[in-house]
Curated annotation (Swiss-Prot):
Lineage of the organism: Archaea, Methanobacteriati, Methanobacteriota, Stenosarchaea group, Methanomicrobia
Any matching Pfam family: TRM
Record GO terms (molecular function): tRNA (guanine(26)-N2)-dimethyltransferase activity; tRNA binding
GO annotation (BP), single: tRNA N2-guanine methylation
Catalytic activity: guanosine(26) in tRNA + 2 S-adenosyl-L-methionine = N(2)-dimethylguanosine(26) in tRNA + 2 S-adenosyl-L-homocysteine + 2 H(+)
Descriptive protein name: tRNA (guanine(26)-N(2))-dimethyltransferase
Amino acid sequence: MDLIEVTEGRTTFRIPVQDPNSPFPPSSAPVFFNPKMAMNRDATVLLLSVLNPEEYLDTMGASGVRGLRVAGECRIPVVINDRDPAAADLIRANLAGAGLEGRVTVEDANVLLSRERFDAVDLDPFGSPAPFTDAACRSAKRYLFVTATDTAPLCGAHLKAGIRRYATKPLNTEYHAEVGLRILLGYVARTMVKYDRGLSPLFCFASAHFLRLHLQAEKGADAADRTVARLGFLYHCPSCPERTEEPGVLPHDHVCPRCGTTMLPIGPLWLGSLSDMALLDQMKERLPDLSLSTERRLGKLLDVLKVELPTSSHYDYHRIAKWIGGSPPAIDVVIARLIQTGYRASRAHYSGTALKTDAPLDAIAAALSAQ
């Protein structure tokens, strides 16, 4: 195969030449490499430079770039796997070319995950991670990282696929990115607790074309019970902006307290925090020390996540303003007004028009209408 040299972060590697006229790289490339996922990989390098696990598994290596970067930029022992022998040959060549050491395996991901355990396991499949989640939850000793690019099923745009893959009820709302992230996290949590293990989110976020989880696995039935307690449902009114969340593994009938419409259940999904605040501080401190091409974007992401409320939904600022009527002030003014009146309020990291708050609708209306 014809190869070209690429540098990402501090790592130089080779990838197959891809047809620039191809609508999507896998249709033309013998080994897949997606340059649009650079921020995803930068986030992994940044986080691992803080966590420093004993060993890291890149379960679906492809070109091997993620594992290569972890080995070279974090100095962490790596195992890079891909079931395609051509990909494995390229990974070995890239390791040798970069002067790095690492174990390369050529196996079905589920077979490898079922046979061996690793301190940190990273799932970055093409599409849904659902077929690999069970084995990954058993294989990960301390850390489990998951990428999902099947955002349409997770966010409710492809409802039946979301139900089939994740055994949950998504809904395509204005806060669909939040729903998708929490459904994915809830699915992994429900898988983990089957083995009397729990989890805690370390650094989870939604981007334009993927969802990314960085999780810490916890041992024991008590940890599993704490994890179950963080699962629940979001109830959405289809007739007005009212919504509410409720912990529990089974949905209940809810009637909108504002308009009397039967509310729609979303879930089960994860309720509560999506990140560890102390860890975000450590990552922000480490960020300037790494040569990351998406340093600025990551810095902004960390800043927003640090103050973002853990509510499981948001109000789209334009929609809520239209519902209330009038000409609203800037979103930051409304956030400040809500905070001044004793409520919590923030932006969301995945949308510039998202307003997150624990204030009731009447208080939001007052903040929007005040002169």
